[in-house]
Amino acid sequence: RKEDLEVVKRLQEEFAAELAALRGRVEALEVRTATLEKQQFSTTTKLSGLVWFNRSTATSFDKNVQFEGIPFDGRTPSAAPGAGNFVRNAGRDAVTGRPIVLRVDEAQSTFSYLTWLTFNTSFTGRDNLVTQLAAGNGISPINEFASAGFFNSFGSPFTDQSAGPQNGSPAVVIHDLFYSFPLSDKVTVTVGPRVNWYRHFDFNRYTFFLTGASSFDSIGATQSNAIDRGSGAVIEWNISPKLRFAAAYLGENTEFLPSAVPGFNTSSDPRFGLFGGTYTATAELTFSPSNAFNLRLMYNYSRLQAVGGQVGGATGEPFPYGQLDAGPGFSVFTPGNNFPSDGGLQFASAHFLGVNFDWAISKGFGIFGRYGYGDVNLEPIDRKVNVQSFQAGLGFPDLFKKGALAVVTFLMPMDITRGRRFFAAGAGDGGTMYELEASYYFPVNDNIALVPAFYAIFNANNFDSNPNIYVFNMRTQFSF
């Protein structure tokens, strides 16, 4: 009404000064709000943790299992059945030039732990500085049956491990240390002195170690990469919702390898450096036409630095297990010595091609698989070693409970197609090892899970004449 408008006009005139002051405060508040929205994030660090208990048993039912290698304590082969020696060196007989073969028929059950504490620090809200600490005391009993260069491989639960270079010692180590930031809306860069390669490559929904397959051999491609952690950078490009590309260069720097030994942790060793020791260059293309299907194609180039004239073991991929040397006449074992003579190699260069897929056919059933092929050239002798591997499996999500996952997988971790004579350990008697695994992830609640697992190992250490080995593991998993 007209009289109401006149009242409003009179009030505006009477309180003009107050309204002007209020308008100024609102404008100032809007400026401050815009500034806060632009710079809203203060440095924040969040702590998360994972703790595992492992109760593990490995048995051949008292049948002798052959393995290649010499005991770490240097005892003569005839006096060393393998008991108590968890890290073995590869050596050849001085007369025949053949790898030394020993036997063991039992391993004691173990109860161990592993813990990871992760600090995630962000400065802008979009970046992430990751510092992960680890400590554990696990030595899986299956290692008692393993040849040199096979430590923590077949039948060994991934979380049944020690974190540092001293097996069984609960030393605290830096597991991961890297910084990730967006270069654009579609490109992310990760850089650091200890980048975890497996955070960026070779993922599979049914073999992720926290909820899926659970052994060292089954959680990823056995041949894919010689570096677990390394110094360098990773670039990830989400080209489209259906296509992703990732590439990396990493110089080896792994928490469980002893830096005091020349040839390990080469990226921080001035004798080798970031580009002169063990390093890898990786490229992976992921095609995801739907949420149910993923196909990954990978290429990896590796330079493998020799240690004691041998290459292999923890930094041997794409030949995942065993130790290579220059052939008979090298790596000669003398009773009473901890180490064999020089293996005759300086380094090896290697190429790996791999394919990896997972397909959720329905809500309660899926299939997955991997295939890999590796070509290794030994220097300075200029000789070739070729190795292939495969994995095939079934996944049963939400079996008996929402969030649960049962996995059955069959795999061939290493089939030597060329160059057996250059294996100082790992080639066995010409056989090929196979593994069968069944595991079941059962979430008790949001923070606790039980994961029973069973592994059967056929032709262990690539000996056709070896008996089967069976592993039973019960994992209790805590997350916070």
Locate the predicted segments by residue:
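N-terminal periplasmic/intermembrane-space "pro-region" immediately following the signal or transit peptide
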Residues: 1-106
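Outer membrane beta-barrel
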Residues: 44, 50, 56, 101-255, ...
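Solvent-exposed loop segments that connect transmembrane elements
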Residues: 63-100, 141-164, 207, 213-214, ...
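Residues that define the transmembrane beta-barrel architecture of outer-membrane proteins
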Residues: 109-113, 171-175, 227-231, 277-281, ...
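Signature for the C-terminal beta-barrel architecture of outer-membrane proteins
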Residues: 185-186, 191, 203-357, 370-374
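Outer membrane beta-barrel transmembrane domains
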Residues: 298-347, 354-358, 368-464
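Outer-membrane beta-barrel "beta-signal"
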Residues: 394, 468-480
